[in-house]
Amino acid sequence: MVRNKAKGFPNQNNNKFEGEPRAKDDYASKRADGSINSHPQERMRASGRR
């Protein structure tokens, strides 16, 4: 069995991903002020369709 370290994958030490994070504020369950975002089914559906 060959482990990932033996295959010589690049970027071993710096595991930061490029680009924006996938989680957007529009689809978060809580707002920045701590209040709960309503309509969770609509929020989850919209998050999956983006």
From Swiss-Prot:
Give the matching NCBIfam families: PRK03081.1 (NF002843), SASP_sspK (TIGR03091)
Query: What family, per the record?
Result: Belongs to the SspK family.
Q: Which GO terms describe its biological process?
A: asexual sporulation; sporulation resulting in formation of a cellular spore
List localization entries.
Answer: Spore core
Output the HAMAP family linked to this UniProt entry: SspK (MF_01504)
What keyword terms does UniProt attach to this protein? Sporulation
Basic and acidic residues: which segments have biased composition? 17-33, 40-50
Task: Please indicate which superkingdom the organism of origin belongs to.
Answer: Bacteria
- Induction section of the entry: Expressed only in the forespore compartment of sporulating cells.
**Name of protein:** Small, acid-soluble spore protein K
Question: Which Pfam families does the annotation name?
Answer: SspK (PF08176)
Region called Disordered, residue ranges: 1-50
* GO CC, any one term: endospore-forming forespore
